[in-house]
Amino acid sequence: LRGRRGTPAVLGRFRYGREWESVTVKEVATVPLPQGGDPSWALVFPSDYGTGISNLGLHYVYYQLKRLGVGVERFFHSPIPNISVESHRPLQDFPIITASIAYEPDALNFLELLSLAGIPPRRKQRDTGAHPLIGAAGAFSSINPSMLLAIADFIVMGDGEPVIPFLVESLRKYSREVDREKLLKALDEHPSILVPGLGEEKALDTLARGEKRGAVTPAGQSVGHGIWVTPNSAFGDTLLLELQRGCMRGCPYCVLPACFSPLRQRPLEMVLDALDRCSSRVPFSQVGLVTPEAGDYPGLDVLLDRIESLGKGVSFASLRIDNLTPRMVKSLRDSGRESLTIAPETGSDSLRKCCGKPFTNGQILDKLEMARMEGMKKVKLYFMVGLPGETDEDVLAIASLAGAIRKGLHMGVSLSVNTFVPKPGTPWGNQPFVGIKEAERRYQCLKRAIAENLGKSFEARFSSPREADLEYRLSWAGPEAVDWMETLVEKRKRGKNNAI
């Protein structure tokens, strides 16, 4: 066994252990964390540490496993792959490995981690006696579990909290059995656990008949806040505070209504209590409100008042412009922010209405004028290109809207432009993907319009159509995708990241 760059495993464990310690020393737990012990369990978030430590799902699963006495340890794709955060053991030492896969590319990262650890990514190539049991969960496992059938022994669909006690009990009861099939049959009894380890065809048939459905955590039954606060998270020194799951909006491009319904809002009293308890226990500079749309949460103003009274700043995971109020803008300004982030999706009023956002460019300008009067100086706008029914005029309207904001309101403006990817289970799931070449053509049309109307130095970031194509392929892939996924992982390992 060798670590990175050929470092002997013992020395590598010491070296990378010290690196992890330099990261974890800045983690402050908001609740007491039990030691845990049995079984030994690798909890993998196949993305970078900053992203993973900002994911409330990872916090919740880790804490619940700890409370059940499980010896759970965290792994991330970077900066130190395949070495656990807690004890600095290699991934292959753990008999149980579960991955929380939030986004499509993370599935590739997980395959890469398994491969680097010497664990065959394909389930059929793993020896039940010599290799760990592999599970998958997370948002992507609910969006497209079919793609994971050739990889995972079992797949948890929906929220993890209602499933974990059953999962732990079953693993403790059957994990020492020589015949793993008894364990897999036990797991298959749960309505939210899909078990491809009993056969891919059976699992596909189960999905087609709708016999397995995502588990749902009732409002108020989750922890409701982050387990750690660390400056190394994607949000900085922030306490994550959950307000709701699911969404009432039903935008046709979004997976939330289809895969993560129903809407569940945490009672305001519970949210306030969690905030007060955490603020009395650990230091943090701001509160991150975790919700699909903060403006839909009842009692938001009361919560913002409480956050302000504690001397904390606030950040919103999402802001819908038609929900934006002076009170919300004031909270951002009082937190030291001068920039606002919104997602008009398109510059066309009619196309935006089709997207489930029936507000006009005029209403956007009115709301931003209010925000400017409240102290906001800049706005970042998110758009999609390749939407169903989109014309070149719709694409050019993005530049027109940006120009109207900058010239009419004298605000700083930046754009983030992404390629629309149809997702399974959504109303627009059956719409065609625009394709790499056409996305690039529309990007060029928009770039020319921006240069002509706003100047070549105007700040606009365009996501890669090639990456969107990969996301689309993974979103709709079946178990056969493991063939080209493995090929891509091997090319990545050889440094050929752009080869698909």
Cite the ranges covered by each PLM segment.
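Conserved SAM/AdoMet-binding glycine-rich loop
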Residues: L43-P46, I96, P105, D273-S414
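Short secondary-structure boundary/capping segments
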Residues: L58-Y60, L114, A150-A152, L171, ...
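Flexible loop/turn segments at secondary-structure boundaries
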Residues: Y49-G52, Y63, P81-N82, P105-A107, ...
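Radical SAM enzyme core and accessory elements
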Residues: L1-L33, W41-L43, E452-I500
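N-terminal [4Fe-4S]-dependent radical SAM core
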Residues: F14-A42, Y49-G50, L194-L240
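Flexible glycine/acidic-rich beta-alpha junction loops that bind and position SAM and/or redox cofactors
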Residues: P298, R327-M328, S350-C355, V385-E393, ...
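Canonical Radical SAM [4Fe-4S] cluster-binding loop centered on the CxxxCxxC motif
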Residues: N55, N232-E269
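Glycine-rich beta-alpha loop elements in corrinoid/cobalamin-binding modules
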Residues: H77-K202, P427-G478, E486-N498
